Structures are given as structure tokens and as C-alpha cells.
């Protein structure tokens, strides 16, 4: 949780005068001080501030202390003295002075703010929150205080509160790239919580497999996505939408014939499946079968023209959304030849196809024009319907998701069933109304809040909201260090270390003091066993944040690789202090102590790490420790456990590899 911890501190320091603006009358003093004393206070205070501006912190410290000898209850001076200590990285002394300032004047915004910042740096988010909220009582329009409050909430793992805080800060600075980046990641963490909850609640369930499949699909790992969609279908053969989603994955992988078979399957179950009609029409267009493509799109337009356009990427759907992905270059060139035929066809579907071709060719103005022709040609006089539950149900059954948006607030009440709420949330999500979808889920009855179905849809909402935040970041500044950082994160998640390293280096070139960047780069370099380069970056991260658990752990591991446990140990001890619940650090500490011959300490750490052992490696290390201690029975038990886990792990891997190979080679598509 250290990824925002030193950011903007220097800027905050420069703004200190706005937070304090002290008078030269100590708190609690009701009568003016004698003129001589007052003059001395003014003189020392002015000298201290000048020294502080000149970065002569030793002189500033002496002058502030001289003021406090004359006026020990001068709260602002205690605070400024604390700041001088802070600028010299004397955090303990700084915090003492901030507390003294607050004891005299509890509402002092600057002292509350900086004390909150210091608790963030110590990893004590809950303590920081109280001080930062106090600072906001008097300085509610300061985005940097809101940013630090969000940081404290992140450290405390209160991601819901962090999201609320970041939205409040974005009201003050709507295009702030730091706030938008953090908002996207806060939503990502909430999504991961839901994924973990679903895995625990319903492991191997259809929804759990579907969520895994969608995750692999978004990372362009199509064979793994196919396997998990197939698993989901085995668990729930009749679940709506699964064949359509599987078809989309196959279509993006260029397996057009297989994709069409999946769309056909979905349409046999539901002839009005909008997604299947749109994608089957797209697949047939890719096959240059215009006569088969246009009827599907004509039918889709008749159901919901706005949603049809959204699925084809003609309406902005989100940063990295699959609907916005271009087809392969060869496919784009091939289908562009269909333009002449389509121009001779006067139908809404033909205009939609022309819009799709233009969008794929990067001609967005022409795409918009053709899309408007398609929409106007399809628009009919629809009798106005009242916003009743029956009418909303009818629209949901017909897949007319765009029609329900104006009715949602009227239809959703405390008496609305959980089933209808979830269906409305699903439709809102499909229509790009992510906040509306989440709100519908948040108001589910208590008994349904933790269901697998609710957890699945919340995870989907958080994923889309994260995407929307990152899209806003892209629009705010497409060349910013935050966007390079985001692209590095995405490439790292996809396993493309080379591209990720390029992006992180680009971000560092623009903002070398940004927390977590050096770690992200160093971690990938360490993963690629580029040890000297990795150490440079990891040490740079520790200059910014000496308590960064990831940087400390990786540095320790670089020395374990070189069999230098005496150098690894200090880093690993510090890493554990910063992240005591991490089993990997426990394992690495056990390894260090084992290599140093301190087997009892090694045993202690390995025993904490074994519950997270999935391949038998930790049990094996523990067995070796017992062997060294002469405890034969314990060693035999751990060796047996290690062998069993290792065999099971290898078996799973072989089966997974076999299935991936089968999926990859089974397609007959060119």
C-alpha cells in the first residue's frame, strides 16, 4: 500500500503558508506581550522563515526554538519547527512538534495535515485518517489533503472510502491525472476483493469461471479464456450470454467459423440476443458475406440501435474495451473493399456497415455520419410507455437496454426484488451506465448482498469503472507520466515485460520522484534476472519510501540468489515489518535463516508460510530444516507433503497445458 506515499509532499510544503498564515500572538495569550519581547519574537520568527526559504534548516531550527523559549504556546511555531525537522527526514521529532502544536490549537490545519502525512509514511493509515479529516474541517478545498486522505484509506484497505474521497477531490480538479490514476486502481482493488470473495464463496462455479474467462479475454490470453468459458458452460449449460462471450473471444482470435457456431448456439437459445446478432453480423462481414451480415445487423438495429453501435465501437465504451479494438490489418484491408457494394444498398444496416468500415479505417467523422444515417433510418415512432415494472421487464426481455435508462430511478424501490435489481444492473452495465449498475447492486436486500450473483456483477462494475477512470486519464493528458505508468501496468499484466519496461522508463524520465515507479521497473528487471539494473531501481524506490515492502523483498531476494543471506536478511526483516501478512516474505526469511544455519528461526518462518504452499517447495525447505536439526520424523512428514503437492501441481499444469494446446490447434479457421 506504499504506492502513493511520498507523492506531492514537496508541493504541500510550498503551500504551507496557505495552511498556517500565523499571527505573532501565541495561542491562549489574551494580553499583548511587552514590546521588547514581541519585537524579539518577530525578529526570531522572521529569521527562521528566511532561513527556511534558503533551506538553511539548522538556522531555522535554532530561530524557531528561540521563539518558543519566549512563547512556548505558539502553536504555529511548533508546527513550523516540525516542518523543518520533516524536511531533514527527522520524522520522529517532526511528529512530536506537530502533536505539541495540536495540543495548543487542535484545529491547526497544517499540523493535522503533516501529522497525517507522517502516519501514512509509517504505514499507519487509520491514525492518519483522523488527522487528515481534521485538516479538511478548515481546508476543505485543498485537493492535496483529499489526496493524502485517499492514500491513508488505501493503506487502511478501506477502498470504498478511498473511492468516495477521490471523487470529492475530482470535483475540485476534474482532470488531475494523479487522482484519476488512483481512482482507477481503487476500483481495481475493489474488483479484486469481489473476485476473491466469489472464489471463496463459489469455487468452480459458472460465475467464477466466467469471471476468470473475462479476465483472460481482457488480457488477450484467448486460449485460457476459451477454457474457462467452456468450464462455465459445463457448470451452467443454459446460462444466457456464455456462448456469445465465447464467440467474441474466438472472433478476436481470428477463429471466425468457430465464433459463428457459438453465436448460432446463443441465438438458438435466445433469437433476440443482441450481442450474438451484432457479432455474427461482424463475423460474416469479415468473411465478405454481406448478404448474410446485413440481416443480422438490421435485426440488431431494430432491437436497440444505440447498444448495437456501442458493441461495434461506434460509441465510446472505455479505455482498452474490446469493442474499440481494431481488426488485424489484413482483415481491415480486405473488408474495406466491401464499401462499394454497401454504398449501393440503401438500408440502415448498410449505413451501419459503412460506419463500421470507416471506424476500423480510422475515419471517425465518416463513421459518425454513417452511424447517424443508420440510427435515423431505424428510428420509428414508438408509443411512449410509462415507467412501470412490467414495461421495464418487457424491455429487458427484448434486449432493449437503452430504453430502460430513464425508468431506473422510478422502478427501483425498497420493494424491488433482488432478481430484477440484478437484471437492471446487468443491462445498465451493457449500456455503459456503470455507476447506475453499481448503485442498483448496492441497494440489494441484505440477504442477497453477498450472493455469488451479486459478487460477480459488482466485480464487473468495478472493472468497468476502473476502465472509465483510466479513459478519463487518457483524455486528460495522453503523454503524462501517469499514462506511461498505466500502460506499463497493463503490459506487465499481459506478460510483455519488454514493453512494460519501456513504459516505466518513459514515466521515470518525466517524473523520477513518483513513488512505486522505480519499484515497478526494478521488479520486472529482477524477474528477468537483470540483477545490477534491478538493484539500482529498487534502491531508488527505497530513497523515496524506505518502508516499501516490495522493494525490500526483491532486494533481499537478489542477495539470496547470490547465496549472500547475511546481505539479504536486513532487507527481508524490514519487508516483513512493513507487510507482516505476506507468506512470500516469511518463506524468503526462512530461506535466509536456513542458509545462515539458524534453523529454529527458519522453521518458525517456514511454518507460517506453508499454508500458501501450492507446489510443495516450502514443505521441502522445511523438511531440509528438520533434517539439519536431526528431527527425522518431522523431515519425513514434510518430504511426503512436498512430494504430494508437487505431484498434484505438475498434474494440474500438464492438464492445463494439454487443454491449451488442444484449444490452440483445434481451429480450422485460416
Residue spans for each PLM region:
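Terminal, low-structured helical/coil segments at or just beyond the last alpha-helical repeat
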Residues: 32, 189, 193, 197-207, ...
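Alpha-helical segment of the N-proximal tetratricopeptide repeat
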Residues: 39-70, 87, 208-220, 350-360, ...
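Helix-start (N-cap) detector for alpha-helical repeat units in TPR-like alpha-solenoids
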Residues: 41, 75-76, 109-110, 143-144, ...
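Structural signature of tandem alpha-helical TPR/SEL1-like repeats
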Residues: 54-66, 87-100, 121-134, 155-168, ...
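Structural marker of alpha-solenoid helical repeat scaffolds
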Residues: 70, 104, 138, 172, ...
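Canonical tetratricopeptide repeat
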Residues: 80, 114, 148, 182, ...
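TPR/TPR-like (Sel1-like) alpha-helical repeat modules
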Residues: 170-171, 181-189, 200-203, 285, ...
Amino acid at each position: 500500500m506504499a504506492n502513493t506515499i511520498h507523492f506531492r509532499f514537496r508541493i504541500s510544503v510550498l503551500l504551507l503558508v496557505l495552511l498556517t498564515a500565523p499571527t505573532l500572538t501565541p495561542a491562549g495569550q489574551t494580553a499583548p506581550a511587552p514590546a521588547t519581547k514581541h519585537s524579539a519574537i518577530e525578529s526570531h520568527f522572521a529569521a527562521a522563515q528566511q532561513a527556511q526559504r534558503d533551506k538553511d534548516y539548522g538556522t531555522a531550527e535554532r530561530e524557531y526554538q528561540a521563539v518558543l523559549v519566549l512563547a512556548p504556546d505558539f502553536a504555529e511555531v511548533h508546527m513550523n519547527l516540525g516542518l523543518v525537522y520533516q524536511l531533514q527526514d527527522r520524522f520522529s521529532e517532526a511528529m512530536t512538534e506537530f502533536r505539541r502544536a495540536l495540543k495548543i490549537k487542535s484545529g491547526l490545519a497544517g499540523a493535522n495535515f503533516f501529522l497525517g502525512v507522517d502516519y501514512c509514511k509509517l504505514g499507519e493509515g487509520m491514525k492518519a485518517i483522523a488527522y487528515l479529516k481534521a485538516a479538511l474541517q478548515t481546508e476543505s478545498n485543498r485537493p492535496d489533503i483529499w489526496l493524502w486522505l485517499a492514500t491513508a484509506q488505501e493503506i487502511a484497505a478501506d477502498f470504498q472510502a478511498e473511492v468516495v474521497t477521490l471523487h470529492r477531490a475530482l470535483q475540485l480538479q476534474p482532470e488531475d491525472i494523479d487522482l484519476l490514476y488512483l481512482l482507477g486502481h481503487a476500483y481495481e482493488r475493489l474488483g479484486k476483493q469481489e473476485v476473491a470473495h466469489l472464489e471463496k464463496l463459489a469455487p468452480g462455479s459458472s460465475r467464477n469461471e466466467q469471471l476468470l474467462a473475462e479476465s483472460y479475454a481482457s488480457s488477450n490470453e484467448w486460449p485460457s479464456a476459451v477454457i474457462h468459458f467452456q468450464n462455465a458452460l459445463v457448470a451452467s449449460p443454459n446460462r444466457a450470454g456464455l456462448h456469445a462471450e465465447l464467440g467474441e473471444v474466438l472472433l478476436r482470435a481470428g477463429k471466425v467459423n468457430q465464433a459463428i457456431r457459438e453465436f448460432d448456439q446463443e441465438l438458438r437459445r435466445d433469437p433476440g440476443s443482441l450481442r450474438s446478432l451484432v457479432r455474427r453480423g461482424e463475423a460474416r462481414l469479415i468473411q465478405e458475406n454481406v448478404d448474410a451480415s446485413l440481416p443480422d445487423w438490421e435485426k440488431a438495429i431494430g432491437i436497440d440501435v444505440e447498444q448495437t453501435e456501442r458493441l461495434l465501437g461506434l460509441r465510446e465504451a472505455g479505455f482498452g474495451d474490446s469493442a474499440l479494438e481494431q481488426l488485424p490489418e489484413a482483415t481491415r484491408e480486405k473488408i474495406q473493399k466491401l464499401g462499394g457494394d454497401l454504398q449501393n444498398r440503401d438500408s440502415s444496416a448498410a449505413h451501419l456497415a459503412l460506419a463500421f468500415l470507416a471506424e476500423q479505417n480510422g475515419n471517425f467523422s465518416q463513421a459518425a455520419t454513417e452511424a447517424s444515417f443508420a440510427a435515423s433510418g431505424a428510428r420509428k415512432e414508438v408509443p411512449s410507455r410509462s415507467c412501470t415494472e412490467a414495461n421495464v421487464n418487457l424491455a429487458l426481455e427484448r434486449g432493449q437496454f437503452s430504453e430502460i435508462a430513464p425508468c431506473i430511478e422510478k422502478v427501483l424501490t425498497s420493494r424491488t426484488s433482488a432478481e430484477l435489481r440484478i437484471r437492471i444492473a446487468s443491462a445498465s452495465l451493457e449500456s455503459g451506465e456503470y455507476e447506475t449498475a453499481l448503485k442498483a447492486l448496492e441497494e440489494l436486500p441484505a440477504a442477497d448482498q453477498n450472493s455469488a450473483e451479486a459478487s460477480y456483477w459488482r466485480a464487473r462494475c468495478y472493472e468497468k469503472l476502473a476502465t472509465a477512470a483510466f479513459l478519463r486519464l487518457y483524455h486528460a493528458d495522453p503523454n503524462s507520466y501517469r499514462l506511461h505508468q498505466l500502460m506499463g501496468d497493463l503490459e506487465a499484466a499481459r506478460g510483455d515485460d519488454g514493453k512494460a519496461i519501456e513504459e516505466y522508463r518513459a514515466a521515470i524520465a518525466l517524473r523520477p520522484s513518483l513513488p512505486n515507479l522505480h519499484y515497478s521497473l526494478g521488479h520486472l528487471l529482477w524477474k528477468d534476472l537483470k540483477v545490477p539494473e534491478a538493484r539500482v531501481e529498487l534502491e531508488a524506490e527505497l530513497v523515496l519510501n524506505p518502508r516499501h515492502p516490495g522493494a525490500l523483498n526483491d532486494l533481499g531476494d537478489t542477495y539470496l540468489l547470490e547465496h549472500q543471506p547475511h546481505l539479504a536478511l536486513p532487507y527481508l526483516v524490514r519487508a516483513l515489518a512493513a507487510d507482516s501478512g505476506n507468506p512470500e516474505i516469511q518463506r524468503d526469511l526462512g530461506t535466509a535463516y536456513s542458509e545462515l544455519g539458524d534453523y529454529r528461526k527458519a522453521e518458525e518462518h517456514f511454518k507460517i508460510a506453508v499454508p500458501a504452499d501450492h507446489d510443495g517447495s516450502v514443505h521441502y525447505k522445511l523438511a531440509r530444516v528438520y533434517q539439519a536439526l536431526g528431527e527425522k520424523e518431522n523431515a519425513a512428514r514434510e518430504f511426503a507433503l512436498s512430494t504430494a503437492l508437487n505431484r498434484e501441481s505438475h498434474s494440474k499444469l500438464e492438464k492445463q497445458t494439454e487443454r491449451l494446446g488442444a484449444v490452440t490447434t483445434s481451429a480450422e479457421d485460416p
